[in-house]
Amino acid sequence: MQIDGYTRLAAVVATPIKHSISPFIHNYAFEKTGINGVYVAWDIPESELQVTLKNIMRYDMFGINISMPYKQAVIPYLDEVTKAADLIGAVNTIVNRDGRLIGYNTDGFGFFKSLGTFADFDVADKVITILGGGGAATAIIAQAAINGAKKINIFNQTAFLEETKEKAKQISSKTGAAIEVFPVEDLNMIQKKVLVSDLFVNATNVGMDGKSMIINDSFEFPPNLMVADVIYQPFETPFLRLVRSRGLKAVNGLGMLLFQAAAAFELWTGKEMPSQEIWQALEKKYKSK
């Protein structure tokens, strides 16, 4: 990678962020596509957020990725947000287009691109049951609604149920999607909804410890159920291990990470990311952990 006076910058902004795999993904893509760009990680306090966004235009950057805890906080400083970002209420990609800052959310797109690529799954006219109501879950729910899902069942913690219901109502009113919200503590209801679902998603952090899962070993799955977990470290959570032991298709969150990045890269550069090459490198890295 040759850095010169014409090199353009992209970055991921969050706190903490030094652990991010995004610089590896995007710098690999810049090098392989021959684009004169560099991608770095900026760990900044919220008090510096507005000036950081101004610097996108000041330095003629491609744009930036936004991670927690700033996905909502950046929205007032943007000139425009896309339909998906507006539905989700969060932005993960900002594009510098002709001096205007446009906010996108590529998380939901990345999730369903992963399912389509690795499991040949299309969410249109399908029934989904999803565990979780946070940022990743909301992105998946909104994208599923945009893509024409028939029914979406959301299970979230009782403490956040009213907030989740309000968000679901907003998404439903703007897309026409049928959405219901239930307490995640009600395992019997989860079982009931999963038995009539086409897709079952864990969008919580339960399983990151490599030991825990929300459902139990006696849980029943319908044949041909597609299963996904947004977690990618560990590479196989107890949840995924259980469903694979029953012979079901299942994917982890690494593909979502890659394809949300690929969508951002294409928005910035107009070039397609060499996703297959990068996937092989990521798989090697995380399978060994």
UniProtKB/Swiss-Prot annotation:
Functional pathway: Metabolic intermediate biosynthesis; chorismate biosynthesis; chorismate from D-erythrose 4-phosphate and phosphoenolpyruvate: step 4/7
Function of the molecule: Involved in the biosynthesis of the chorismate, which leads to the biosynthesis of aromatic amino acids. Catalyzes the reversible NADPH linked reduction of 3-dehydroshikimate (DHSA) to yield shikimate (SA).
InterPro entries: Aminoacid_DH-like_N_sf, NAD(P)-bd_dom_sf, SDH_C, Shikimate_DH, Shikimate_DH-bd_N, Shikimate_DH_fam
Pfam families xref list: SDH_C (PF18317), Shikimate_dh_N (PF08501)
Residues holding NADP(+): G132, G133, G134, G135, A136, V230, G253
Subunit architecture: Homodimer.
Organism of derivation: Streptococcus mutans serotype c (strain ATCC 700610 / UA159)
Active site: K71
Gene Ontology MF terms: NADP binding; shikimate 3-dehydrogenase (NADP+) activity
Binding site for shikimate: S20, I21, S22, S67, N92, D107, Y232
NCBIfam families, per database record: aroE, PRK00258.2-4
Protein encoded by which gene: aroE
Catalytic reaction list: shikimate + NADP(+) = 3-dehydroshikimate + NADPH + H(+)
Recorded family membership: Belongs to the shikimate dehydrogenase family.
GO biological process, one term: amino acid biosynthetic process
Coiled-coil residues: none
Name of this protein: Shikimate dehydrogenase (NADP(+))
Keywords linked to the UniProt accession: Amino-acid biosynthesis, Aromatic amino acid biosynthesis, NADP, Oxidoreductase
HAMAP family: Shikimate_DH_AroE
EC number: 1.1.1.25
